[in-house]
Structures are given as structure tokens and as C-alpha cells.
């Protein structure tokens, strides 16, 4: 029976009734849960009209701050712990496989591809010289040749997109026949997530610091394997236990040491998870 005079008790049921004919079952499931939780949130918090409009403005501003070089919504998701929760639920690495973590808002498609051993840092480099090397294998220890490593990091003065520069401190490398990779970059440094937008204001308002521990981003792909999005973190960084985006996992913490040439050096081996299709075919 149609209802015109809704109240606090009847409104939610009517909103849910109106999406009953949603043809996509997954969309219906998601929207049903979203409506229930959103209405429950409003009942619990009981925002005033002004407070509700403040929330609407925050989301509107978050959209305005997002573009092809910066994703403020990802930053919001990261700093609220939602990105890591999605990661936990969807990428559960089995024993021996490399753990994933958040992608973050600063990945840029179309990074230049370099030969192994090349330097992703412009001259002069924005930081201390560093060499990173390792191997990519499957769970059985077999090297994966031709795997693509899309890497990116911040310099001492921020990410390239924050400085308005052309691509710097990012690039794509491919493993050799033995699954090995090596490249030059700068030693990762700790840095603040952007504080000039709505997410930065949210952190300030809630008494949180914006710092991320020093790390290097990796997005690793290879045919027959799930894409791995992860970091390696610098051992000893003071923000490892209070990462603003909750992204640290102990298995990803790496010791960076000086080599004989006075450069920083780190080594890390990645183990990829076979794709669902590959597991079915096995």
C-alpha cells in the first residue's frame, strides 16, 4: 500500500521498497545495505540541517579537489581505513606470497618504461641515490620472466604531480629471464599526505597527523597472476606504527643499507598469487 505521510519509522522501508525491482542482484544488495546503514547512521548521530549540509559540502569539495593527477576520494578512503579494509577482504595472501597494501592517490597511468638498471630520478635527483633489486617468483619458487613493475615514489620535495612536474620518480621495468629486476631511484622518505584539501582539514579537525612512513610503491603484473599492489617500507622509520593510511604490514618492512659506493641499497623478492583462471586450469 502506498504511503504518503512518511515518518522516522516508515521512511527506510519505503526507500527499500522502491529499489526492489533493481535488475542487477549485486547492485540491489549493495544499495540495500547502503540505505540501511546510512539511515541508521542518521538516526544515531541525529545531525542538524547545518551539520548535514557541512557533510554534503565536504563530499562536494572532495570531488572538486579530484582530477587526473590527484584523487581526493581515494585519499579520504585511505585515511578512514576503508581502503585497507577492502584490501584485507579481497587480497588475502597465502603463506609465502607477498602481501598487498593500499594503492594511494598518486599512481599515474602511462609512466615511461625503462631498461633494467635505469634511474627513474631526474637530474639532479630529489633525494639520496638508491638501488633497489630483487626477484619475482611464483609460489613454487619459479622465476617469472617479463613481469611488469610499475613503481613510483615521492622525493624530498613531494610527488611529481604535487610540484607540477613532468613524470619523475616513477617508471615501468620488466624482469629478465631469471625473474630479476634492478633499478635506481632515491631513498624513500616519510612525507605528509596532502593537507591542503578537505581530507587534510578532516585530519586536523580530528587531531591526527598526516604522515606516511617512507616507502616505495609497486604495481606488479604478469600473465596468469593477480595484479599485486604493494609497498616496501624503510625499516626504522618513525611513522611505521602510525601510518596515516594504515598501510604498513611487517612483511613489507625492508632494511635499506649503504653499499660500497655510498648509495642506499635494498633488496626484496616478490611472490605473486596465481589468477583465478590459472588456478582453475591447473
Regions found by a protein language model. Name each.
Residues 2-282:
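Beta-strand-dominated extracellular/periplasmic modules and repeats
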